[in-house]
């Protein structure tokens, strides 16, 4: 796929765990786990874009440097287009909704749920 061909030499299914996230960012991946293979990278781009706040995403792009940030942006564009064309999902609208809901979570209630406390 087009996505897999962007940084094929940067994927390492064995040594990805030794990379820091910053090293992965500089290689054009949004997480060190995403640098393990293209399929994981694809999902990590989408998942992290949806759940991480703007400050995290902006910091990642800044720390990635010009080359890493350009690669991440290229990957994001592919993910965004794919979701829109294949699933009719507006990634920005989905992210906005997830971000809004995350702000309104009652963490105290969630942490007190019986299944989380092993009961």
Positions of predicted regions on the chain:
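Active-site-flanking segments in enzyme catalytic domains
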Residues: 1-119
């Amino acid at each position: 796929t087009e996505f897999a061909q962007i940084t094929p030499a940067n994927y390492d299914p064995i040594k990805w765990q030794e990379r820091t996230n910053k090293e992965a960012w500089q290689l054009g991946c949004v997480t060190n786990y995403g640098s393990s293979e293209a399929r994981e990278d694809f999902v990590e781009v989408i998942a992290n874009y949806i759940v991480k706040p703007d400050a995290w995403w902006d910091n990642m792009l800044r720390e990635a440097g010009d080359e890493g940030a350009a690669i991440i942006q290229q990957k994001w564009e592919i993910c965004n287009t794919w979701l829109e064309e294949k699933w009719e999902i507006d990634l920005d609208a989905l992210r906005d909704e997830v971000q809004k809901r995350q702000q309104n979570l009652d963490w105290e209630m969630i942490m007190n749920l019986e299944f989380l406390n092993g009961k």
